[in-house]
Amino acid sequence: KQIAPYALEHLKNSDVFFRTQKLADLNGFYKAFGMEVESIERADHISTQTEFLSYLLLKEILAEKDGLFVEMGICQDAFDQFQKDHFSDWAKMFAENTATKVDGIFYPLAGRFLSISLETEKYYGSTTFRRKNDKTK
Protein backbone atom coordinates (compact mmCIF):
# COMPACT_ATOMS: atom_id res chain seq x y z
CA LYS A 1 0.00 0.00 0.00
CA GLN A 2 2.83 2.45 0.80
CA ILE A 3 4.26 2.14 -2.69
CA ALA A 4 1.06 1.67 -4.65
CA PRO A 5 1.02 4.05 -7.65
CA TYR A 6 -2.64 4.91 -6.94
CA ALA A 7 -3.68 8.08 -5.11
CA LEU A 8 -6.61 6.44 -3.32
CA GLU A 9 -4.34 3.85 -1.70
CA HIS A 10 -2.61 6.67 0.17
CA LEU A 11 -5.80 8.06 1.73
CA LYS A 12 -6.86 7.11 5.23
CA ASN A 13 -10.53 6.86 4.28
CA SER A 14 -11.14 3.38 2.84
CA ASP A 15 -14.92 3.73 2.48
CA VAL A 16 -15.94 2.38 -0.93
CA PHE A 17 -18.40 5.22 -1.57
CA PHE A 18 -15.77 7.83 -0.73
CA ARG A 19 -13.29 6.19 -3.09
CA THR A 20 -15.88 5.88 -5.84
CA GLN A 21 -16.66 9.59 -5.49
CA LYS A 22 -12.96 10.47 -5.65
CA LEU A 23 -12.56 8.47 -8.87
CA ALA A 24 -15.66 10.17 -10.29
CA ASP A 25 -14.18 13.57 -9.36
CA LEU A 26 -10.95 12.72 -11.17
CA ASN A 27 -12.77 11.50 -14.27
CA GLY A 28 -14.93 14.64 -14.20
CA PHE A 29 -11.82 16.81 -14.10
CA TYR A 30 -10.35 14.92 -17.05
CA LYS A 31 -13.56 15.12 -19.09
CA ALA A 32 -13.92 18.86 -18.44
CA PHE A 33 -10.70 19.32 -20.41
CA GLY A 34 -11.45 16.80 -23.14
CA MET A 35 -9.45 13.85 -21.82
CA GLU A 36 -10.92 10.44 -21.17
CA VAL A 37 -9.18 7.62 -19.35
CA GLU A 38 -9.27 4.69 -21.74
CA SER A 39 -6.29 2.79 -20.44
CA ILE A 40 -6.35 -0.23 -18.19
CA GLU A 41 -5.23 2.01 -15.32
CA ARG A 42 -7.55 3.77 -12.92
CA ALA A 43 -8.01 7.53 -12.97
CA ASP A 44 -5.93 7.85 -9.79
CA HIS A 45 -2.82 6.10 -11.19
CA ILE A 46 0.27 8.29 -11.16
CA SER A 47 0.79 7.84 -14.91
CA THR A 48 -2.77 8.99 -15.65
CA GLN A 49 -2.45 12.00 -13.38
CA THR A 50 0.94 13.07 -14.74
CA GLU A 51 -0.35 12.64 -18.29
CA PHE A 52 -3.26 14.94 -17.45
CA LEU A 53 -0.94 17.55 -15.93
CA SER A 54 1.25 17.48 -19.05
CA TYR A 55 -1.90 17.71 -21.21
CA LEU A 56 -2.94 20.87 -19.34
CA LEU A 57 0.52 22.37 -19.88
CA LEU A 58 0.29 21.59 -23.60
CA LYS A 59 -3.17 23.18 -23.83
CA GLU A 60 -1.80 26.22 -22.03
CA ILE A 61 1.11 26.57 -24.46
CA LEU A 62 -1.18 26.22 -27.48
CA ALA A 63 -3.63 28.77 -26.05
CA GLU A 64 -0.81 31.25 -25.50
CA LYS A 65 0.53 30.63 -29.01
CA ASP A 66 -2.92 31.37 -30.45
CA GLY A 67 -3.41 34.46 -28.29
CA LEU A 68 -6.21 32.82 -26.28
CA PHE A 69 -5.19 34.30 -22.95
CA VAL A 70 -8.44 33.58 -21.11
CA GLU A 71 -8.14 29.90 -22.06
CA MET A 72 -4.49 29.98 -21.07
CA GLY A 73 -5.46 31.25 -17.62
CA ILE A 74 -8.10 28.54 -17.29
CA CYS A 75 -5.45 25.90 -18.01
CA GLN A 76 -3.06 27.47 -15.50
CA ASP A 77 -5.72 27.53 -12.80
CA ALA A 78 -6.79 23.96 -13.56
CA PHE A 79 -3.17 22.77 -13.38
CA ASP A 80 -2.66 24.43 -10.01
CA GLN A 81 -5.99 23.20 -8.63
CA PHE A 82 -5.49 19.62 -9.83
CA GLN A 83 -2.00 19.51 -8.43
CA LYS A 84 -3.17 20.88 -5.07
CA ASP A 85 -6.35 18.78 -4.73
CA HIS A 86 -5.43 15.51 -6.42
CA PHE A 87 -1.70 15.09 -6.90
CA SER A 88 0.97 16.78 -4.78
CA ASP A 89 0.35 15.33 -1.33
CA TRP A 90 0.02 11.69 -2.25
CA ALA A 91 2.70 11.86 -4.97
CA LYS A 92 5.17 13.11 -2.36
CA MET A 93 4.36 10.15 -0.07
CA PHE A 94 4.61 7.76 -3.01
CA ALA A 95 7.97 9.20 -4.09
CA GLU A 96 9.47 9.04 -0.61
CA ASN A 97 8.24 5.48 -0.02
CA THR A 98 9.52 4.35 -3.42
CA ALA A 99 12.92 5.90 -2.69
CA THR A 100 13.26 4.26 0.73
CA LYS A 101 11.23 1.04 0.74
CA VAL A 102 11.90 -0.60 -2.62
CA ASP A 103 14.88 -2.84 -3.29
CA GLY A 104 17.08 -2.44 -6.32
CA ILE A 105 18.52 0.57 -8.06
CA PHE A 106 16.05 1.92 -10.61
CA TYR A 107 12.89 2.50 -8.55
CA PRO A 108 14.61 4.08 -5.54
CA LEU A 109 16.38 6.47 -7.94
CA ALA A 110 13.09 7.21 -9.71
CA GLY A 111 11.48 7.85 -6.33
CA ARG A 112 14.24 10.27 -5.36
CA PHE A 113 13.97 12.03 -8.72
CA LEU A 114 10.21 12.45 -8.28
CA SER A 115 10.65 13.64 -4.70
CA ILE A 116 13.22 16.25 -5.73
CA SER A 117 11.04 17.36 -8.65
CA LEU A 118 8.03 17.82 -6.36
CA GLU A 119 10.08 19.73 -3.80
CA THR A 120 11.52 21.97 -6.51
CA GLU A 121 8.06 22.70 -7.85
CA LYS A 122 6.78 23.38 -4.34
CA TYR A 123 9.66 25.76 -3.64
CA TYR A 124 9.52 27.66 -6.93
CA GLY A 125 5.80 27.28 -7.55
CA SER A 126 4.22 25.55 -10.48
CA THR A 127 3.41 28.82 -12.21
CA THR A 128 6.39 31.01 -11.34
CA PHE A 129 7.63 31.22 -14.92
CA ARG A 130 4.20 31.18 -16.50
CA ARG A 131 2.74 33.98 -14.34
CA LYS A 132 5.72 36.21 -15.12
CA ASN A 133 4.75 36.10 -18.78
CA ASP A 134 0.99 36.15 -18.24
CA LYS A 135 -0.60 38.78 -20.47
CA THR A 136 -4.00 38.56 -18.75
CA LYS A 137 -2.89 40.15 -15.45
Residue ranges and their predicted role:
Residues K1-K137:
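Surface/interface-facing alpha-helical segments and adjacent flexible terminal/loop regions used
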